[in-house]
Amino acid sequence: MPLMAKAAAMSGAVGIRANTVRDITQIKEVVDLPVIGIIKKDYPGTPMYITVTMKEVDELVACGVDILAVQGTGALRPDGSTSAEFIRAIKAKYPDQLVMADCDNFENAMACAEAGADFVGTTMRGYTPETQGIDDIDFDFVHKLATECPAKVIAEGHIHYPEQAV
């Protein structure tokens, strides 16, 4: 992954999104770009898999991730907490840590932003039961978030061609 990050930086990337403490640590050693960090892990009984527990948050903060991303959908975490409750707990423990919520719909994005997420991403749109079947970038969704959500918006997922990113 460090070589991929170097290639991305040389091509003009302004940030890197990476999974696992190992990859994040190695990437931060070779590029001077902000890193959005996640830890993907499956948990029985929940569809949540992107930075699901405080243990993963602690690991990401310890490795110096610039922005910590968590799943911000309507499913409950293994401990029964909502995405908004989890974000509030992260901000209480790490008030200076930037947090991104990987969301699927407007309601979840707003709840995460109101709970303290600094960024909301469209990452999970099309990947939850509520949004299943959305296979292309949803510009109306991105526009609604950009105009109504208090957090900064990162359009992510289902962007297949450079023309879609403009």
PLM feature spans:
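Catalytic cores of alpha/beta
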Residues: 45-60, 104-118, 151, 155-166
